[in-house]
Amino acid sequence: MRVKDFDHLVLNVRDVERSLEFYCGPLGLEPIRVEEWRAGEFPFPSVRVSPSMIIDLLGRPRSESNVDHICLVVEPLDWQQVIDSGTFTVLEGPVGRSGARGEAQSVYVRDPDGNTVELRWYPQDVVED
């Protein structure tokens, strides 16, 4: 498995609107899916850091960490082989999820310190033989 990019970071925030004001105001980041979130059509809004990186703002009371999980883009691969290898403690997946570049296939794993890491690949990255 090879990591290609950093896709997104999910922050647990107490007040989503206040966080949107901070990231879109003084930091000048582009809001994403805000109206869909306000209409109850999407579970959270995001802000775009770069064409391939976003920060998701997840409304939650503060827990032990303000970071819910990080997401790394990997080269397209067979998730079942990854799961069967026993290399990772798999928490969830494979599942289809939305990210910085659209829909992707993801597996959630736990790192040695208990942090959740989402590993994902995008269908558009598959190279046909």
Language model features: what each stretch is:
Residues 1-17, 67-70, 125-129:
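N-terminal beta-strand motif that seeds the catalytic metal site of vicinal oxygen chelate
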Residues 57-60, 64-68, 73:
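Helix-adjacent hinge/juxtasegments
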Residues 10-54:
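Core segments of cupin and vicinal oxygen chelate
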Residues 38-43, 64-66, 100-105:
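Short acidic/glycine-enriched loop/turn segments that link adjacent beta-strands
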Residues 55-58, 108, 118:
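Conserved beta-strand in the GNAT
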Residues 16, 70-116, 124-127:
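Vicinal oxygen chelate
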